[in-house]
Swiss-Prot record:
Site (Transition state stabilizer): C153
Binding site for substrate: R44, G45, A46, R85, Q192, N243, K244
Domain of life: Bacteria
Protein name in UniProt: Methylthioribose-1-phosphate isomerase
Stored HAMAP family: Salvage_MtnA (MF_01678)
Length: 342
């Protein structure tokens, strides 16, 4: 199933809020539509957010041409898209790449600039697919035959340009013939695990079991989990990692039970400008995502709601970070810095 495609000057994205029971597409004709797709979680996952934002810049520059606006309008478009979601660093990384292309080409004709922006967006997309495969290959070396793997949220093809980061590792292990089983946290409140990860695994024939988030510790105590693999939305220089809310709790449980805890992410998810997780902004989303379930109110009006979308897992709880350039072990600050030099 194609989950996004740019064709006929439109970006068409699969509405992931409707999966797995409805297959509905959202058409982005303008950069404002792209903002909505990111902000409202029609699409999600740090790498995919970056790709979609890049195509948003393309749509924005198309509008500049059609309305005969000054090319400098692109800076407003870049800032607008940057405000869609604050935590995933791939968003800012992709927008910075698009900005650089524009600034190097700004003396060319608008049509030439448009072509170069389109080429860069496609390049970001194509690179991500290749990067995911490499992440999977490196991560597969950590997966033992017969491993029971726990994952959280969705870090699969639906969250990336294709194949996935955490699920890329799982796919590589499965396709290599390893007899693995995946436990999938449902991942409240958006249920990305139950709706998306279980869907992807089932489509590939990978054995999986969906569990409620609060069951993970019990499974670990029973000896049913051999490792935990999750994705990431932003990684600090010291290895602290922001990922879907609930990841921190899993890391604490895994550390207590002596279970390896792996982060799987492209180098573009590393923010080399921040030293620790304390500098990562944590997005808070609408109370209604918790107040309502399947369109029905389940929380009393008198009760307050706290709905952070992410938490930060400290580096000391992380066994290794799997990237396209290899597996990074502690000391993270030293070894992450080396990645930039490679």
């Amino acid at each position: 199933m194609k989950h996004f495609e740019f064709e006929n000057d439109k970006l068409i994205v699969l509405d992931q809020r409707k999966l797995p029971f409805e297959k509905e597409y959202f058409v982005c004709s303008t950069y404002q539509d792209v903002y909505i797709a990111i902000k409202d979680m029609i699409i999600r996952g740090a790498p995919l957010i970056g790709i979609v934002a890049a195509y948003g810049v393309v749509l924005g520059f198309k509008e500049i041409i059609e309305k005969n606006m000054d090319s400098a309008k692109i800076y407003e478009i870049l800032n607008y898209l940057a405000n869609s979601r604050p935590t995933a660093v791939n968003l800012f990384w992709a927008l910075e790449r698009m900005k650089k292309v524009f600034e190097e080409a700004r003396n060319l004709s608008k049509s030439q600039i448009y072509s170069l922006l389109m080429q860069e967006a496609k390049k970001i997309e194509d690179e991500d697919k290749s990067i995911n495969k490499k992440i999977g290959e490196h991560g597969n070396t950590l997966i033992k035959e017969g491993a029971n793997i726990l994952t959280h949220c969705n870090a699969g093809a639906l969250a990336t340009g294709g194949y996935g980061t955490a699920l890329g590792v799982i796919r590589e292990a499965f396709f290599a013939g390893k007899n693995i089983h995946v436990y999938v946290d449902e991942t409240r409140p958006y249920l990305q695990g139950a709706r998306l990860t279980a869907f992807e695994l089932s489509e590939d024939g990978i054995p999986n079991t969906v569990i409620c988030d609060n069951m993970a510790g019990y499974l670990m105590k029973l000896g049913k989990i051999d490792c935990v693999i999750v994705g990431a939305d932003r990684i600090a220089l010291n290895g602290d990692t922001a990922n879907k809310i609930g990841t921190y709790s899993l890391s604490v449980l895994a550390k207590h039970h002596g279970i390896p805890f792996y982060i799987s992410a492209p180098i573009s998810t590393i923010d080399f400008n921040i030293k620790s997780g304390s500098e990562i902004p944590i997005e808070e989303r609408s109370e209604d995502e918790i107040r309502f379930f399947n369109g029905k109110k389940i929380v009393p009006d008198e009760s307050k709601v706290f709905n952070p979308a992410f938490d930060v897992t400290p580096a000391e709880n992380i066994t290794a970070i799997i990237t396209e350039k290899g597996v990074v072990f502690p000391p993270f600050e030293e070894n992450i810095s080396k990645l930039k030099e490679k």
